[in-house]
Amino acid sequence: MCAPLELVIIQLGTNDFQAPFGIRAWAAASGVGKLVEIVRHAPLEPGMPQPRILIVAPPEIVQPKGTNEKKFEGAVERSNGFAAALAEMAVAKSVHFFDLNPITSRSDIDGIHLDANQHDVIGKAAALVVHGLIVRSKNISDSMLHAK
């Protein structure tokens, strides 16, 4: 059983675009949608509320280079529209969505991973998003508790 969880964050999908899998954006987003359902149906302790869910869109894949070039051949094309597909999935599943594309990008070194400074950017931005979701929820819960 799951203990009380405030928020479950799902940021997946990049490896789905490896050449051997041949997966396109909508299929990868559907996989994330299935994970949302798994979280929603996980057994909870009695009286525990369902956790909120945040889907995070990873930065777009740029041209893979080096050792990742063959492994991710065609990934740029197959992943095209992934953030939009994840945003649609978030709406369909009534969960929160955060797109990393406006704030960060993949490394120029291999086109797949993130440089160290990008982890810092993402961490700071994610902390603000998560804080906002948790504080907003607590304020709503507190107001419900104090309603007369």
Sequence positions of predicted segments:
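Alpha-helical cap/lid subdomain in secreted, periplasmic
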Residues: 1-148
